[in-house]
Amino acid sequence: MIKKFDKKDEESGSGSNPFQHLEKSAVLQEARIFNETPINPRRCLHILTKILYLLNQGEHFGTTEATEAFFAMTRLFQSNDQTLRRMCYLTIKEMATISEDVIIVTSSLTKDMTGKEDVYRGPAIRALCRITDGTMLQAIERYMKQAIVDKVSSVSSSALVSSLHMMKISYDVVKRWINEAQEAASSDNIMVQYHALGVLYHLRKNDRLAVSKMLNKFTKSGLKSQFAYCMLIRIASRLLKETEDGHESPLFDFIESCLRNKHEMVIYEAASAIIHLPNCTARELAPAVSVLQLFCSSPKPALRYAAVRTLNKVAMKHPSAVTACNLDLENLITDSNRSIATLAITTLLKTGSESSVDRLMKQISSFVSEISDEFKVVVVQAISALCQKYPRKHSVMMTFLSNMLRDDGGFEYKRAIVDCIISIVEENPESKEAGLAHLCEFIEDCEHTVLATKILHLLGKEGPRTPVPSKYIRFIFNRVVLENEAVRAAAVSALAKFGAQNESLLPSILVLLQRCMMDTDDEVRDRATFYLNVLQQRQMALNATYIFNGLTVSVPGMEKALHQYTLEPSEKPFDMKSIPLAMAPVFEQKAEITLVATKPEKLAPSRQDIFQEQLAAIPEFLNIGPLFKSSEPVQLTEAETEYFVRCIKHMFTNHIVFQFDCTNTLNDQLLEKVTVQMEPSDSYEVLSCIPAPSLPYNQPGICYTLVRLPDDDPTAVAGSFSCTMKFTVRDCDPNTGVPDEDGYDDEYVLEDLEVTVSDHIQKVLKPNFAAAWEEVGDTFEKEETFALSSTKTLEEAVNNIITFLGMQPCERSDKVPENKNSHSLYLAGIFRGGYDLLVRSRLALADGVTMQVTVRSKERTPVDVILASVG
């Protein structure tokens, strides 16, 4: 029956695409009708439509066949049929890039452009500008100037929009039309004024002073076009973000005044601009929030949606500013548009008090099954934020999330819930068992491999430390029996972690691992064999190295290094220290909840891997070993100065490479042979400088300085460098960018650059700190006590220590429990050269904070460095 229905439907043509089965060769054959006399407009229109359809579907036209069809089409200009003529303009625009000698229609288009038929003039201008190149533009310049100030709005708008496109081809010619564009900007037509403002801005956007003057002029004289007002607000907002005046600027006053405009579009644009300004206080946000509050009760769904979506964004940073809208948002919970209702309730979750959480969760439960997965993810995001804000409400959240987890839904939705539950488990120790129980139940019927492996990893990490770890073994071993290879392998790893940390469970785990050795998959068998052999040794140090604490190196970096090792066989064993460290351990990274993810995630090279590759390509850096760590960029110039310079410190075992990213902001200068000369304050030795060959206006360039670390005193890791940028200046024409032949040497003093102890240490997470502590041993252990007299709270002390040392807090020890007078902070890292470094800091609060620091490493130097730096 279904097949019969489909056939009938296809024959009747109802709902089908008449161009679905077009063949290019047949259409080009039909195009010969263009040469017939007299011209048949109706048939020609149909064929042109087919050609446009094929072009827009991505059909490839060869140059010869496209040119033949184009030349045949030019004969259609002999017809006076308006629809056919306008279809010709469209076809010219589409075929301009694939046909040869398209300029043959220039005279016909120029004639239409300057003719008396207004209906032809606008489209003719757009088509003409599409086929015109830089050499021909001057020939039509006079006509373009006239068209820009034409009284017919469609002609003027066409000329202005075409001018915007022509800027890419010949900016200097279009710049001569600025007077006409200014005249068009005073037009009464809203679209002409909008397009004219766009042209004026793009002609001046590289000159901040000219943009400021333009804004000044239009903010004082006012505009008639609401579209132009929106553009003006965006320009003002962009300028505000770049200047230091901020909210004291007249530009901010202008944006605020637009909140009182008669057009809703302008009011919303102004409110959105204020909300997205950086460093906006709650007081400055208040007028914008008030306007959005009014929009919440608008009869137009689009306005209500825009308002609640924007308030949702405000609530992320300034929840207190949105509190005044809570009543309006509660009214929107019952909105017929489920998207609006969802955004309203998620906003309320961010702004509501702890007492309102239960009521809001009940309201969400009533309609959550009716909304799309995309908005369910938004709800989960809001719940996740709420868990961090009100940790005592985790039981309510957990119940709600577990119910959502049982409902039908796609991968992204399920992943968002799993990530949220994992976050609650990690942040609230008292919710651990309930969360793990819900996740165990979920993996019993989970069709997503990624989620199953993630949950198994969490069970292996958190399960062994629960009061009754044995209850999780059944759920994990079920995965070995029932699931695919990837999940079975993850389950084997989780079982090994239970055996490594629970002596009473070890015999049972060994039996289960022996069963896994009979698996059909290589990966599962190899893991089982490996873990079985490690566990049979019954050594805590081995367990810590090979089971608890995974690889701390970059996975893409390791893959590349191993591939290189196989290409160049060597008698030496592969050195793991030749691989860059991972910026953050794989198991520490929390997956961000995203609204859309269409492709499977590919492990992309990290920032560290990219730097490693860039530096390895420079001959001077070939023999200094693998990259250990790259710092965050440090700015060495003030904003609004002639040159913008920032530095990234690349640490190697015995060297530092300073990478200077330089930008020349002067359009009348070309800088050449740019270097940064560094004068160290201590026993650092500057070895070489690698210049940036040239720095044209606004184009970034990179220069490097190579420095050797002190040999005589390994603990002298901190230092200060005075920096001076030296270069050759060649003056140039700001308009053309052509430089003078002669240049002169000049220099520019930069801010001093500091190297601190944190630059020499890479963060690394140890999931089981106690095991790692025992693994390192006490051979080079040292302990000292310090008084932090200026520190008043334990939280402040913890944050200062973490920031100063640049190490990774373990066991969630960076969170200080409430109403405690003592706390233990556990830090882990790797010191330059690849040495494990562990710090245990016991803090006690009295008049100030007293700190007992114990440091362990397998080498003496890292221990001495930490104690010397803290002291």
Swiss-Prot record:
<dbReference type="InterPro" id="IPR002553">
    <property type="entry name" value="Clathrin/coatomer_adapt-like_N"/>
</dbReference>
<dbReference type="GO" id="GO:0005793">
    <property type="term" value="C:endoplasmic reticulum-Golgi intermediate compartment"/>
</dbReference>
<keyword id="KW-0333">Golgi apparatus</keyword>
<dbReference type="Pfam" id="PF01602">
    <property type="entry name" value="Adaptin_N"/>
</dbReference>
<keyword id="KW-0677">Repeat</keyword>
<dbReference type="GO" id="GO:0030426">
    <property type="term" value="C:growth cone"/>
</dbReference>
<keyword id="KW-0597">Phosphoprotein</keyword>
<comment type="subunit">
    <text>Oligomeric complex. Binds to CDC42. Interacts with JAGN1. Interacts with TMED10 (via cytoplasmic domain).</text>
</comment>
<dbReference type="InterPro" id="IPR032154">
    <property type="entry name" value="Coatomer_g_Cpla"/>
</dbReference>
<dbReference type="GO" id="GO:0005829">
    <property type="term" value="C:cytosol"/>
</dbReference>
<keyword id="KW-0813">Transport</keyword>
<dbReference type="GO" id="GO:0006890">
    <property type="term" value="P:retrograde vesicle-mediated transport, Golgi to endoplasmic reticulum"/>
</dbReference>
<dbReference type="GO" id="GO:0030133">
    <property type="term" value="C:transport vesicle"/>
</dbReference>
<dbReference type="InterPro" id="IPR016024">
    <property type="entry name" value="ARM-type_fold"/>
</dbReference>
<dbReference type="Pfam" id="PF16381">
    <property type="entry name" value="Coatomer_g_Cpla"/>
</dbReference>
<feature type="repeat" description="HEAT 6">
    <location>
        <begin position="467"/>
        <end position="504"/>
    </location>
</feature>
<dbReference type="InterPro" id="IPR011989">
    <property type="entry name" value="ARM-like"/>
</dbReference>
<feature type="repeat" description="HEAT 3">
    <location>
        <begin position="321"/>
        <end position="355"/>
    </location>
</feature>
<feature type="repeat" description="HEAT 2">
    <location>
        <begin position="283"/>
        <end position="320"/>
    </location>
</feature>
<dbReference type="InterPro" id="IPR012295">
    <property type="entry name" value="TBP_dom_sf"/>
</dbReference>
<dbReference type="GO" id="GO:0006891">
    <property type="term" value="P:intra-Golgi vesicle-mediated transport"/>
</dbReference>
<dbReference type="GO" id="GO:0000139">
    <property type="term" value="C:Golgi membrane"/>
</dbReference>
<keyword id="KW-0472">Membrane</keyword>
<keyword id="KW-0931">ER-Golgi transport</keyword>
<dbReference type="InterPro" id="IPR013041">
    <property type="entry name" value="Clathrin_app_Ig-like_sf"/>
</dbReference>
<dbReference type="InterPro" id="IPR013040">
    <property type="entry name" value="Coatomer_gsu_app_Ig-like_dom"/>
</dbReference>
<keyword id="KW-0653">Protein transport</keyword>
<feature type="modified residue" description="Phosphothreonine">
    <location>
        <position position="594"/>
    </location>
</feature>
<feature type="region of interest" description="Disordered">
    <location>
        <begin position="1"/>
        <end position="21"/>
    </location>
</feature>
<dbReference type="InterPro" id="IPR009028">
    <property type="entry name" value="Coatomer/calthrin_app_sub_C"/>
</dbReference>
<dbReference type="InterPro" id="IPR037067">
    <property type="entry name" value="Coatomer_gsu_app_sf"/>
</dbReference>
<dbReference type="InterPro" id="IPR017106">
    <property type="entry name" value="Coatomer_gsu"/>
</dbReference>
<dbReference type="GO" id="GO:0006888">
    <property type="term" value="P:endoplasmic reticulum to Golgi vesicle-mediated transport"/>
</dbReference>
<feature type="repeat" description="HEAT 4">
    <location>
        <begin position="356"/>
        <end position="392"/>
    </location>
</feature>
<dbReference type="GO" id="GO:0072384">
    <property type="term" value="P:organelle transport along microtubule"/>
</dbReference>
<feature type="repeat" description="HEAT 1">
    <location>
        <begin position="64"/>
        <end position="101"/>
    </location>
</feature>
<keyword id="KW-0968">Cytoplasmic vesicle</keyword>
<dbReference type="GO" id="GO:0005198">
    <property type="term" value="F:structural molecule activity"/>
</dbReference>
<keyword id="KW-0963">Cytoplasm</keyword>
<dbReference type="GO" id="GO:0005783">
    <property type="term" value="C:endoplasmic reticulum"/>
</dbReference>
<dbReference type="GO" id="GO:0006886">
    <property type="term" value="P:intracellular protein transport"/>
</dbReference>
<dbReference type="GO" id="GO:0030126">
    <property type="term" value="C:COPI vesicle coat"/>
</dbReference>
